[in-house]
Structures are given as structure tokens and as C-alpha cells.
Amino acid sequence: MVSSSTTVPRSGVYYFSQGWKLVTLPGIRRFVILPLLVNIVLMGGAFWWLFTQLDAWIPSLMSHVPDWLQWLSYLLWPIAVISVLLVFGYFFSTLANWIAAPFNGLLAEQLEARLTGATPPDTGILGIMKDVPRIMKREWQKLAWYLPRAIVLLILYFIPGIGQTIAPVLWFLFSAWMLAIQYCDYPFDNHKVPFKTMRAALRTQKVANMQFGALTSLFTMIPVLNLFIMPVAVCGATAMWVDCWRAKHALWK
């Protein structure tokens, strides 16, 4: 288990695996339920609909492959499928995080208190309701940072050759970094750390965050497992916060 005494940051793979363990801790499971329900309803329904549409979408996407790349069609077809899953998975993951943001913040707060022995501010339904405007403002900040970059990458998908080869790789790397920001931000925001300061802090552990975000992105594409990924990622990111940044940025001890 992660503890506040841990001084050496570990890999993103470690923190992601810790997330799966931490969601089962007694006393933490009840804070997992609401984020889990939001994710199951939204991601479950979204991916069921997606798989009914893939037969039409993939041929349409492959029609943009230029003649000189047709000989690579057998390789580009799975890349096209992965591209659709990446974009679709990230979009609905972002939507689910918007809806569940107050509950994800509460989960991060309670887990941090459990891992460190620190006393969090008073929480409850009234506390969550009071914090909703601030939490939603933070989600808008993340969206404003994300959208311009995402639009540029999506435009690349419509460029013959690049859209079927380079764009999926760039999108995967971008979504990995953005998912690291999304989930690590919950404990940072609980301590009122500004969004810009949070991003600067994450860059000090860039490799670990890319590993964490990449695994989160991959699991978002896997049916059944993607239903559980939201609370798992919140817990893993909170463990990373405790080890890497809490000593410098904590508002409450």
C-alpha cells in the first residue's frame, strides 16, 4: 500500500496497478460506487452502440487511404479500428468524468486521508454541492486546454496517408497525457492547486505520467474492463499524488 512515508516515486505502471488494489480497501469502496455507476451506464451504453456502427465506419475511414498505400491495407485496417476506439473512448471517458467529477474528487480526498492519516475538510452531500461550481470551472479549464489540440489532431485524420499512419500514434500519445492530467487533477484540485501549476508538476514526472495515461487509455478501449477504469484511475492517480507531489502542494496535512 502507498503511504505518506514513501519518498521515491515509482513508475506509472506501478501506480496503475495500485489503483486496482486501492478501490477494494474497506472504507473506500463506498466512495467508489457512484463513479463506478456513472462509468458503467455511460461507457457501457456508448461502446455497445459503437460496436454496432463499426462495420459502416471502418470502410468509410479506409476509403481515404491513397492508392499508393493500398498494399498496406491489411495493416491499416486494425490501425483504423484502434483509432476509432481511441477517439471514441476518450470522448466518452471525458464526458463520464464531467458527470462524475464531484464524486471522483471525494474519492480522491478520502483515499488520500486513508493513505496519509491526514484529516480532510468536512465532506458530505452539502460539501459536494458547495464545491460543484469550483469543480465544474476546473473541468472547463481542462476542456479549454484540450480542445484546440484535439481539433488539430482530428484534422490530421482527414489527410490521406497521415490520417491512417501517423495520426493514430499522435492521438494515442496525446490521449495518454490528457488522461494523466484528467485523473491526477482530482487530488491537486482538492488542495486548490492552480491548473497551470498542476501541469508543471506533472511534467516533473513525465515518463511515469505517460505510462499511467497510456495504460488508462488502453483499458478504456477494452470492453468490460473499461467499465471499471474511472475509479481505478482516480485511486492510482491519488497514490501518485501522495508519493510525488503532496509534500510540496498539500493544503491540509
Swiss-Prot record:
Membrane topology label: Multi-pass membrane protein
InterPro entries in alphabetical order: CysZ_sulfate_transptr, Sulfate_CysZ
One annotated GO molecular function: high-affinity sulfate:proton symporter activity
Annotated transmembrane regions: 31-51, 72-92, 151-171, 222-242
Keywords: Amino-acid biosynthesis, Cell inner membrane, Cell membrane, Cysteine biosynthesis, Membrane, Sulfate transport, Transmembrane, Transmembrane helix, Transport
Gene Ontology CC: plasma membrane
Alphabetical list of Pfam families matching this protein: EI24
KW Cell inner membrane (keyword) present: yes
An example Gene Ontology biological process: sulfate assimilation
Localization annotation: Cell inner membrane
Keyword Transport included in the entry's annotation: yes
Known role: Possibly involved in sulfate transport.
PANTHER family registered for this protein in UniProt: SULFATE TRANSPORTER CYSZ (PTHR37468:SF1)
NCBIfam families according to UniProt: PRK04949.1
Family statement drawn from the similarity comment of this UniProt entry: Belongs to the CysZ family.
Listed name of the protein: Sulfate transporter CysZ
Source organism per UniProt: Salmonella typhimurium (strain LT2 / SGSC1412 / ATCC 700720)
